[in-house]
Amino acid sequence: GVDYEGTRSRSACSMNYSMDEYARHVVQTFSELCAEADLPHPDLISESGRALTAHHAVLVTNIVDREDPGTRMPEALAEDAPSPLRNLWNDYWMLHQSDSGRSPVEIHHDAAQALADIQTEFAHGLVSLADRAQAEEVHNSIGLLLQKRLNPGNRVHRGLLDELNEKLARKLFVNFSMFQSLPDVWGIDQIFPILPLEGLHRPPTQRALVRDMTCDSDGRIDHYVDGDGIEATLPLPEGDDISLLAFFLTGAYQEILGDMHNLFGDTDAVDVRIDGQGEPRITHMAR
């Protein structure tokens, strides 16, 4: 097997044993059976395709565009704004000015209820589309402020933080077709480690979602390897200077299963070998 997650667990995309442990158990089993039956010990040949080939390839591609959640300060309310919208605004303003004295979880619950009230009133024709749009903008702004106040080490905060990270994550539109380059993500929910190739000296303080460049809404990645296990968002360093993402452990089956999709050309390929001095050398390039 291959520990794609790095969790050393019994998950479908992980393994809770080492290669040495696996080999010892196999050899020991044959050794004991042959000794019991007084048979010669055979040469053992294993065909462990995924374990042998997964590590040999990495997909590197560039971020084409980004879509961020609204981060500007919401506009002031009209005098005749509906009551639930005023409740939302009051929560936002207290958070924006200083600590409101209420717990982040309580504020989140109250804001969610106020937004639900606005949506219900809109469905019944009691508030305008502009009111609903402003309520959603204020609700997002409350979430962004709460994100900064939540402590990931606090068990009570953790669930809410995960929810806000997913809802308020920026979307990264990346120059590849998932169906061509990572078909197992779509087909069997395979998890691959993903890492930015810049800014690794900075703490990962923002969250993102990866989207490919195809016309299909399934062209997205929903599960990401994180230090705490598998998360719904990808941790990234702060800033807009991240331009390259690497998808690791893609050497098993992805290229042979993938095919041309949405007029994407074939992915450029570079063969790299390590020479006798331990230096990487490019031995072949295909465009």
Model region roles, listed by residue range:
Residues 19-34:
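Alpha-helix-loop-beta-strand connector modules within alpha/beta enzyme cores
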Residues 35, 39-287:
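Charged (often Lys/Glu-rich) extended helix/loop segments that serve as interaction or gating elements
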Residues 1-11, 50-58:
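Active-site-proximal loop/short-helix segments
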Residues 5-20, 69:
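Glycine-rich tight-turn/loop motif centered on a GG-T
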Residues 6-7, 27, 39-41:
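Gly/Pro-rich turn-and-neighbor structural signature
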